[in-house]
């Protein structure tokens, strides 16, 4: 339950972060890509007619969470710190740094990139829930969807980075991606610590 509750905060906060990246970006074609990405996340795509937060709410039902439980959850201190970090990166830094910070977190779900580690985060978490909780992949619509959706999202902004993150900009973007991954690790570690305390 802790995982899904904190994930719901992460997913909702990303909408703000992508909006900051779009607001900072002067390139109309990139803004259009961001809006396309956000339409899939917030409105509808092939995985949900109601946006991806709906997938988390549906996934919560088999483990005893109501929509209210998910929507009214409070952040762990580490979740709050990570969300503040991403918010600052995407609002105060350049649009390319913000784009890199957001895009790298999509890569965490991509089985193609992380096959040597047993797959992306969504696949590995889903497998744990199947093995330890006796659920099926049909009970896990969020992780099932993100195994596919984030393949497209992983690839979506690579041409943009290849075009605009050149010269000295390349190192800046790589550093932003590293910092974003550090935030992601802190976010995940906080969830793990909270789960250990109740087990």
Show the residue positions of the predicted features.
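Amphipathic alpha-helical segments within well-ordered protein domains
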Residues: 18-22, 57, 126-130, 158, ...
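Acidic, carboxylate-rich catalytic segments that either coordinate divalent cations
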Residues: 164-199
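Accessory, usually C-terminal, subdomains that scaffold auxiliary metal cofactors
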Residues: 134-177
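Short acidic alpha-helix initiation/capping motifs at coil-to-helix transition points
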Residues: 9-14, 50, 117-123, 151-153
């Amino acid at each position: 339950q802790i995982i899904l509750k904190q994930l719901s905060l992460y997913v909702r906060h990303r909408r703000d972060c992508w909006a900051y990246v779009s607001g900072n970006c002067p390139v109309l074609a990139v803004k259009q890509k961001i809006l396309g990405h956000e339409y899939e996340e917030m409105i509808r795509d092939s995985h949900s007619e109601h946006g991806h937060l709906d997938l988390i709410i549906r996934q919560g039902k088999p483990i005893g969470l109501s929509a209210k439980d998910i929507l009214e959850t409070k952040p762990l201190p580490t979740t709050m710190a990570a969300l503040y970090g991403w918010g600052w990166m995407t609002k105060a830094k350049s649009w390319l740094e913000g784009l890199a910070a957001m895009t790298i977190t999509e890569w965490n779900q991509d089985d193609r990139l992380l096959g040597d580690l047993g797959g992306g985060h969504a696949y590995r978490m889903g497998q744990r829930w199947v093995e330890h909780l006796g659920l099926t992949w049909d009970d896990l619509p969020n992780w099932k969807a993100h195994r596919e959706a984030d393949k497209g999202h992983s690839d979506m902004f690579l041409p943009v980075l290849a075009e605009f993150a050149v010269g000295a900009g390349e190192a800046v973007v790589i550093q932003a991606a590293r910092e974003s991954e550090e935030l992601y690790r802190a976010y995940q570690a906080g969830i793990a610590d909270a789960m250990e305390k109740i087990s």
